Amino acid sequence: MSKVKTGITLFSLGTPYLKGKLDLEGVIRTAAELGAEGYEIVATQMIPSYPFVSDEFVEFINKCKEKYGIGPICYSANMDRGMLKDRDLTEDEMVARAITDIMSANKLGCTVMREQYLLSPEGLKRIAPYAEAYNVHVGIEIHNPESPITPAIMDYVKVIEETGSKYIGFVPDFGCFAIKPNKPYWDRALAAGATEEQLNKCAQLRYDEVPLEEAMKIMAEDIEKCPALGGTLNSMYGFVQFRKSCTKELEGLKRILPYCFEMHGKCHYVDENLHEVSIPYEEIIPVVAASDYDGFIVTEYEDEGGYDAIEQTTRHVAMVKKLLNQ
């Protein structure tokens, strides 16, 4: 059986942090108060010296750990391929950045690092020896619109299995299992003048797997009346897409679970009954619980809808614990 621990990615509290309502210590303290057993830190957002970690920052993190009882369990790195004005980073440059991130993760005491899939499968293969040397398990984030069964992710599976390395794998984001439209996007469209009838028509086109270009043509007259509808329809085919069922995707998750180092418990809106309205946690958590997974599910509140970040994070942690019978 699994040994699931619950944590929080500090990204969940990014809005109060960026607005100055909480400093970094306040964010860590709040995560502890909400029941996190550990936290993921988004390096670009909260480490002043990123991509490096200073001795002073390590000292600060260790003092917070002594005070609040939780420390960083995952170093969330970014692969900013487009950071230069005139060209994309080469693969060699991206590999070098990933190695720097591995070293920083190790210095901070993290044994897991989230990497983005802008790093190619070959790049992941190349960093495996460094991950092992620094005892940092590097997981490619499986983020919507990818899923455990899409060709791009299967290319990583092939490399992981070919190398046999225990230090390269995945960090699945539960948003890739969505089966209903995203509530924040839906509500914004309503506020911009779209009707429920128009939005339901858009959703049905997505459920029916009508290609985006064709769907745009079908909805052209409605989009002309309400331009915001175009962005909402486009989002249904992008990073917040959904499908009728996630059964196949969950079967794919079962296959890659031995390669998973952490899981992102994505949430956009958790209601007062502890139900995420678009992501079927009631189907996802039993799959993880029945496995041999030994790691964290970290709450990741996306904060697209302007809801209270602390309330949403609190609800999500409670929902996961309830489904895990913890």
Language-model segments: which ranges?
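C-terminal helical cap(s) of enzyme catalytic domains, especially alpha/beta-barrels
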Residues: 309-326
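Hydrophobic faces of well-ordered beta-strands that scaffold small-molecule active sites
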Residues: 4-11, 39-41, 72-77, 113-115, ...
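Charged helix-capping and loop-helix junction motifs
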Residues: 21-25, 53-59, 91-99, 121-125, ...
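Active-site beta-loop-alpha junctions enriched in small/polar residues
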Residues: 9-15, 42-44, 77-80, 118, ...
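Glycine-rich, proline-tolerant flexible connector loops at the mouths of alpha/beta enzymes
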Residues: 38-64, 304
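Gly/Pro-rich active-site loop or hairpin
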Residues: 15-22, 149-153, 180-294, 307-311
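Active-site mouth loops of central-metabolism enzymes
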Residues: 9-23, 81-95, 116, 241-244, ...
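Active-site acidic/histidine proton-transfer and metal-coordination neighborhood
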Residues: 29, 63-71, 81-172, 176-222
